[in-house]
Amino acid sequence: MKLLSLSLLALIACAADRPPAIDRERVLIGPVPLKRQLAWIDSALDRVVAIDASDDGHPSVHSWRIGRRPVFAAPTPDGERVLVVTRGEEALERGQVDEDPLLWSVDVRDPSSKPIAYPVSSPFDRIAVSADSGIAVAYFSEAGPDAEGFFRNPNELAFIDLTRPPDETNPTMKTIRSFGSAPSGIVLSPRMAVPGAEDPSERIFAFVLARNVVTIVDASHPDRDEVSIRLDGAGSNVLPRELVFAPNTATAYMRSDGARDVLELVLINDPPDANNPTANDYHPLLAELGAGGAPSDIAVFDTASGLRYVLAATPATRELVIIDADTAQFRKVGTPDPIDRIVVFPGNGEPATTAVLAQLGAPMPRVHSLSLGDIANPLARLDLETIEVGEPVRDLSPVPGRDLAMMVHDDNRTVLGMLDVEFRSVSPLQGIGRLDTYAFTPAGDFLVGTTTGVPRLGMLELSNLHPTDLRLDYPPRQVYALANGALIVDHGDPFGRATVVPTTASERKDAHVLSGFLLAGLLETESP
């Protein structure tokens, strides 16, 4: 195993002119997993540092300077950029500069790339990003003002078009109507067109969730007016939790705490007022689906013919509701248990073939399988098949792109099983140890995991359930499986320590240990 160490502490102690960064309060944000990188954000050094697990098996470390005092970071869904909100500061002493809050877009693919700074006016601590990585919305969490927040507007949002450089219209700052509640989250829709609208383009809509209200903003045109819709009529105290979309009909289906039923939100054409330059061209309609019970979980899938369906579990009625997303017609299937977990296989956007249902709230030693092959046939009989698994199921995690699911049978993650969805069979997972952290490789061929305090990386080949392990030099904190097949184990060292394993077939001699990389170049940091 190769050890790359950066011995900087002695040099720092002897430095005559200490850089201001040495005396700053230091908070590390991350790691943030990306396509083939793992990134950290350093609040003292004002930079993003990333390990690049390159395809040639030789990792490298790169850094990018950003603004002062990072608050929050999030990856883009394509795994190519990391977005960071920085608070900025007021220059009051040596080493400080006047700087407003900014959102930084850092392209980690290119070590020479220059981060793009978008002025966002407020130190937001949450970021929502569209599935195509083109639009970001920065907002405040429900945590309330921090120690430095004198005034804070919880209903303020910043809409950023990540495909354009910053200008007078990018970002667009917006304050939405609150109706007495602050946003609990933001969900960005896939691109979808409003049926019948004069503007036929496919747009992204931001669904701003709050207690008893949902506000919808055209995120592709954030300067246009938002529309809010009250949820009080759907229950006594409705808190939206989850949305799934049917973009063909500009429809969202919502699961909410406190709602009596599955809620349907449909965007319809509403021609704008020609005298109002900020008028929008849509209006939402809210409907209770009539499924007869509040859903505990929902899932969306597409058939081989391109039809979209929504599955909703209603434990109070012990039913699974199957909704045609384009017509809102539905049918019900009785369930032996009050289901609160739905997993659709094979996943990864492929046409679904099977749904597996489980009761996790009050764990039972069984799961249920529903074939989705005849789901579009209204005359087809839909029956559940019960699969006895021997131990209560406390968690159910699908393997990416495979008809497999890992079952956890105890709170310590020591008793595990692998469910083969196609053959309805269960195999106990042995020789792995306690899974404190784990990940599936993107191809779904390996389960990798670590145990706190044990310097080993466990690997389970899912085609034959053969376990192997790799000895590490240091105890692990978290393991990450990147899109290019590389594995990175973070050891939780504040100065930076990680083990990079090029592939699951790599031996110990092929692994690289990077130590001290978060301090690289500290003495070269310029002093203002």
Name these PLM-found stretches.
Residues 1-13:
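Sec-dependent bacterial lipoprotein signal peptides
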Residues 14-528:
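Predominantly soluble domains enriched in secretory-pathway, periplasmic, or organellar proteins
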